[in-house]
From Swiss-Prot:
Organism per entry: Homo sapiens
UniProt KW keywords: Acetylation, Chaperone, Cytoplasm, Nucleus, Phosphoprotein
The protein's name in its UniProt record: Nucleosome assembly protein 1-like 4
Chain positions with N6-acetyllysine modification: 105, 146
Compositional bias segments (type: Basic and acidic residues): 121-137
InterPro entries the record matches: NAP-like_sf (IPR037231), NAP_family (IPR002164)
Motif (Nuclear localization signal): 265-271
Gene Ontology process terms (BP): nucleosome assembly
Pfam families the UniProt entry points to: NAP
Similarity comment text for this entry: Belongs to the nucleosome assembly protein (NAP) family.
Primary location: nucleus
UniProt-recorded Gene Ontology molecular function terms: chromatin binding; histone binding; nucleosome binding; RNA binding; unfolded protein binding
Keyword rRNA processing: no
Chain residue ranges for the region called Disordered: 1-31, 116-137, 339-375
Amino acid sequence: MADHSFSDGVPSDSVEAAKNASNTEKLTDQVMQNPRVLAALQERLDNVPHTPSSYIETLPKAVKRRINALKQLQVRCAHIEAKFYEEVHDLERKYAALYQPLFDKRREFITGDVEPTDAESEWHSENEEEEKLAGDMKSKVVVTEKAAATAEEPDPKGIPEFWFTIFRNVDMLSELVQEYDEPILKHLQDIKVKFSDPGQPMSFVLEFHFEPNDYFTNSVLTKTYKMKSEPDKADPFSFEGPEIVDCDGCTIDWKKGKNVTVKTIKKKQKHKGRGTVRTITKQVPNESFFNFFNPLKASGDGESLDEDSEFTLASDFEIGHFFRERIVPRAVLYFTGEAIEDDDNFEEGEEGEEEELEGDEEGEDEDDAEINPKV
């Protein structure tokens, strides 16, 4: 009997496997030429989440090597940017000296130490004509009250409660102020910003100048904010300019019984053996704006702060930055409320742009939607 297990020296099962492979390739070619199959495959590929990192992983080693070179260049750019911001800080210091005579005069007008001249107090409002018309109408209505109108108006010294009014107008600050803080803040006469000396680490100091009062003996309360303008070695690509990294307050020399940052509570204690009861008093922290001068310290020993402490510290940094960049340079506009209106309008404009963009996107999806023009 002939042996059929081999054909021309090739095992029969190998021949069968080759035939199956050939048939599989032909079937695959036929399937891949089917438009419906291709469309289904494309749809599945489109639904697969795509991330930049997943794309980078697919690149050849030679391309990845060049990308690493680009990252090296980016780090060098970050260090150049850090030097740029250091020079900006030097410029801020230079121009702060030019602003200061104007701020000193502002303080004199606020405190009433100096009365502005007619030329210095002349100001033309954008709504001057409307105000004049309203004044004319009012004068016609109150003709019968001329006698009362001629009475001398009160003329307080300077601009009373100037800085306290700013605290009330600005939400970020008013949220910190308690009712018992208010009479103290009415003694606030000036807020100044002082920059670090040339060659010293970047920092700025907020100075709160108070007139003599019944609450503490300090004439000036200070808050120092320390800054850093260098890329983080662990994450150099996160660098976006100088950042506040820590702050120091000052000791407030409170007069007896006037410290609003603590409150006294009474607590009864019962002796376990004798059963006698005694009342003890102790001081506990109290919410107050003046806790601003006793801030949390940023962790410098490598230990991370808890979430609440991190939030408190970040809020403190934000307030310090706001005093420096907004409140002190534009104080009169926060007193009148004009700067607050500008801030609100800017925020509303941003929201409006987002809503308009969302509407445009919806319109693109609904190609058949009916358009109803507004008349």
